[in-house]
């Protein structure tokens, strides 16, 4: 039987004012439910950077890492975190914001399918959003680069109708901006 582990590692010190201010700003900006969601994203970015350092150390020791390095970079490029011509050193520059930008919740707002992060979260949790033909109900789902164009409303959802009040408000705002 496998033992489940935590997906996150909390801060080393609980009451650092500067960190608390940054965390609060990020939680508001990305519409996170609690600090655990932020810590999970931080842990993901930290593990990617640690693996890049590990590969750099192996390469410096003279070991062949070309295959391992290529697999790792391909994975991050498919996730859309790195550009197509990125190198291993670019992984060291990744931050928690890079991970948070790939969340489904964030992508909905960036694509204009939801007005706010909270609304995007509600649409996802209530099962109104489909990615690549499958309903996804996890706001923390990391969207791959190839799936960006395949984010849409579920066809049988009331929100699929362009006349739905939640969608009409978006269209009204667009027409007001165009006429101004």
Swiss-Prot record:
Residues 154-180 are annotated as: Disordered. GO terms for cellular component: small ribosomal subunit. Residues 102-174 form the S4 RNA-binding domain. One of its GO terms (molecular function) is rRNA binding. Residues 164-174 have a biased composition (Basic and acidic residues). SUPFAM superfamilies: Alpha-L RNA-binding motif. It comes from the Archaea. GO terms for biological process: ribosomal small subunit biogenesis; translation. Keywords: Ribonucleoprotein, Ribosomal protein, RNA-binding, rRNA-binding. Part of the 30S ribosomal subunit. Contacts protein S5. The interaction surface between S4 and S5 is involved in control of translational fidelity. PANTHER family: 30S 40S RIBOSOMAL PROTEIN, 40S RIBOSOMAL PROTEIN S9. One of the primary rRNA binding proteins, it binds directly to 16S rRNA where it nucleates assembly of the body of the 30S subunit. Belongs to the universal ribosomal protein uS4 family. This is Small ribosomal subunit protein uS4. It comes from Nanoarchaeum equitans (strain Kin4-M). The gene is rps4.
């Amino acid at each position: 039987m496998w033992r489940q582990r935590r997906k996150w590692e909390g801060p080393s010190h609980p009451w650092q004012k500067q960190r608390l201010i940054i965390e609060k700003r990020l939680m508001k900006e990305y519409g996170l439910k609690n600090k655990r969601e932020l810590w999970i994203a931080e842990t993901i970015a930290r593990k990617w950077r640690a693996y890049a350092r590990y590969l750099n150390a192996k390469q410096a020791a003279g070991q062949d890492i070309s295959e391992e390095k290529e697999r790792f970079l391909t994975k991050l490029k498919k996730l859309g975190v790195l550009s197509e011509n990125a190198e291993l050193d670019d992984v060291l520059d990744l931050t928690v914001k890079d991970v948070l930008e790939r969340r489904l919740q964030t992508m909905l707002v960036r694509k204009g399918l939801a007005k706010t992060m909270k609304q995007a979260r509600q649409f996802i949790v209530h099962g109104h959003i489909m990615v690549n033909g499958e309903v996804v109900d996890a706001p923390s789902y990391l969207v791959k680069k190839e799936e960006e164009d395949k984010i849409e409303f579920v066809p049988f959802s009331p929100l699929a109708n362009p006349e739905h009040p939640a969608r009409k408000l978006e269209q009204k705002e667009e027409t007001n901006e165009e006429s101004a």
